[in-house]
Regions:
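Histidine/acidic-residue-rich, glycine-tolerant segments that coordinate divalent metal ions
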Residues: 9-14, 29-37, 41-42, 48, ...
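A non-catalytic alpha/beta surface segment that caps or lines the substrate-entry region
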Residues: 1-17
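Active-site beta-strand-loop-beta-strand hairpin of nuclease catalytic cores
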Residues: 19-23
Length: 155
């Protein structure tokens, strides 16, 4: 664990040898007269905990995990400096955990939201006027293929 990517207070620790790289952002800040505020103590702790939890699973999962210390988050643009200096270069995805004003009995996670999607078509005679039809099944298949391809590229 050493300062890295142009920031003296940044660090990175990588687990695993082969496979797609998953970056866990360990966000922190030291604000004058406040210290670690805006949930950065929770963000850093959760990201480190997730990384340590994955440490013994990286070979089994076929991934690499990088814990990336991202300082200067309140106005300093720490992640921007890290991005400009290549810290996220090989990442297939990067994640972080952030506290918010949600009830733990009914949490909201944007990554697992459910959506109801309806496809509407328009009937047409295949021989008489096929150009007047709208095939809803084509749109549905396209959504499935694109969502599946996107998921495959994540890891």
């Amino acid at each position: 664990m050493y300062p890295t990517h142009g920031l003296d207070t940044a660090f990175e620790v990588t687990f695993g040898k082969d496979g797609p790289l998953v970056v866990l952002c360990v966000e922190y800040d030291a604000l004058p007269e406040i210290g670690h505020a805006c949930g950065h103590n929770i963000i850093a702790t959760c990201s480190i905990g997730a990384g340590l939890g994955l440490r013994n699973l990286v070979d089994q999962l076929g991934i690499r995990v990088k814990l990336l210390g991202t300082p200067a988050e309140e106005g300093g643009g720490g992640k921007i400096i890290l991005l400009d200096n290549g810290a996220f270069e090989d990442a297939k995805c990067s994640m972080m955990i952030h506290p918010g004003p949600y009830d733990v009995a009914n949490p909201t996670f944007s990554t697992i939201q459910q959506y109801k999607v309806e496809f509407f078509g328009k009937d047409a005679h295949a021989a008489g006027a096929p150009e007047e039809g709208i095939n809803a099944l084509d749109a549905q298949i396209q959504l499935f293929v694109n969502a599946s391809t996107y998921r495959q590229q994540m890891l």
